[in-house]
Amino acid sequence: ITRLAEECNKWNLPLIVEPTTWGSKLTAEKKRDVSLYADMARIAGEMGADMVKCDYMGTPEEYQAVVDNCPVPVAILGGAKAEAAQVAKTIEDALSCGVCGVVFGRNVWQSADPAATVKGLQALTYHGDRDTFLKLCK
């Protein structure tokens, strides 16, 4: 990460790091351990990431440790395609503990209208407008 951060700095490119728990060495329970993500986010920031993209899990009170522990902004990833109401709750919970935003893929690309979904994400993330989000993200 540090070498890549140095290269990104040369070209004035931001480095977004996504710490992962892929692989078979961790139990399913450990892969959902908020304290592990808090440590991974901190390490990514210390190694030169400009932003960290993490899975959201637990409660806002638990996830606060990820945001507080990380020296750079934290955004949440979208994960698997989900129902709009669940996505809205996840975003609202994450924003309540200080994440800087969302970095979504499948919930945009797999929607019926990706452009409308992006507008809905903007409405919810920037303005707290859940109704517009739910209307646009059917």
Annotate each PLM feature.
Residues 1-74, 82-100, 104, 123, ...:
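Alpha/beta enzyme core
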Residues 87-88, 112-121:
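Histidine/acidic-residue-rich catalytic or RNA/ligand-binding cores of hydrolases
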Residues 23, 111-112:
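Surface-exposed loop/turn and secondary-structure junction residues enriched for glycine/proline
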Residues 117, 135-138:
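Flexible C-terminal active-site loop/helix
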Residues 106-110:
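A short, acidic, flexible beta-alpha connecting loop/helix-capping segment that sits on the rim
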Residues 79:
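Cofactor-binding loop segments of dinucleotide-utilizing enzymes, especially the Rossmann-like FAD-
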